[in-house]
Amino acid sequence: LVEQLVRHNQSEDLQYAVYCSRKSYNNERWVYHGAKTEYVGLNANGIQSIPYDIVSLIKAARQSDVVLILGVSGCAFLPIFRLFSQKRLIINIDGLEHRRDKWNKWARKFLKFSEKQAVRYGNVIVTDNKGITDYVLSEYGKPSELIAYGGDHVLQDISADESDAALQKYGLTANKYSLAICRIEPENNVHTILEAFSQTPDQQIVFIGNWNKSAYGNDMQEKYSKFDNIKILPAIYDLRILNVLRSNCKYYLHGHSAGGTNPSLVEAMFFAKPIIAFDCIYNRESTENKACYFNSSKILIDILNDSSLDFENNAKSMEAIANRRYRWDIIAKQYESLY
């Protein structure tokens, strides 16, 4: 998000300052696409993310007119922040982190407290999905600005030769495989998708993710890699290869169930492929109820075997929605209107 806001800034009156973790960069740049960059000597993720956010907030209070906060982990500090700064705070609360299964009870309590402080002390609250917009209104009685994510940065000119080479590398034939890409976590319904394909041997799936990062991932890989129609691949970070795989798949499977508009879903929609998504309010809002939806392996099997479904219209609708709602020039202007 920050990358694209900076890249799409066309205003001479708007100057971004971005706070970065020194731990994540070997070479520090002090200007990036016109934005000033400042470095904090703490990790931006994990337990250090909280002091990292606090240090960044203190620096921003001294140097900026408006402070844009992405995520709520550091917002527990806002009651203290307001004692010495009345700077305008725009806070994107992201997904509902306190509801995610991967956090223990105490982490969830802390994240819920931080979310509450964000909504209380923020001048403007940004939500990325109508499901979260409705949640903030019902939970806190406060309206929020609905701004999603862009996905058109994935569109690239890729030659037929480059595309053929990538497909050949992975032993794939265009439009003969389904594709899923995600972090390998239970809330992304990896098991639900793989179980369905294990029972439909005539349907091939390529599943890309960080399989070796958890016991869950290792278990999934061990259980399902033995099926001839299931190709399990490690995480791929080359955007061009990912785009070849996305643009040549038969169906795109999206199993995310946790809060908000998911960037990987938005990106996939630009490739005009049929989307089969887990049935939750966030995915239905993102796709305007025009994709196919499953909430069990059985229903997914039924979808895969149902030749009467209008997958062509599904694909056209996904592309049309993406171009109407999820272009970065639109998203950047929406944010700039809040400053």
Task: Enumerate the language-model features and the residues they cover.
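A charged, aromatic-enriched C-terminal amphipathic alpha-helix characteristic of glycosyltransferases
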Residues: L309-Y339
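Short hydrophobic beta-strand element within catalytic cores of glycosyltransferases
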Residues: Y251, F270-A277, R284
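Membrane-proximal helix-turn-helix segments that form the acceptor-binding/catalytic region
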Residues: I58-R62, A107-I125
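Conserved donor-binding/catalytic core segment of Leloir-type glycosyltransferases
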Residues: L167, G171-N188, L194-T200, I205-I208
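Nucleotide-activated donor-binding/catalytic signature segment of Leloir-type glycosyltransferases, i.e.
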Residues: N218-L239
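An aromatic- and histidine-rich active-site surface loop
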Residues: Q48-A61, D65-D94, G260
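Donor nucleotide-sugar binding/catalytic pocket of nucleotide-sugar-dependent glycosyltransferases
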Residues: R88-I91, E115-D164, L172-N175, A180, ...
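N-terminal strand-loop element at the rim of the active site
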Residues: R7-G46, G131-E139, N212, Y216
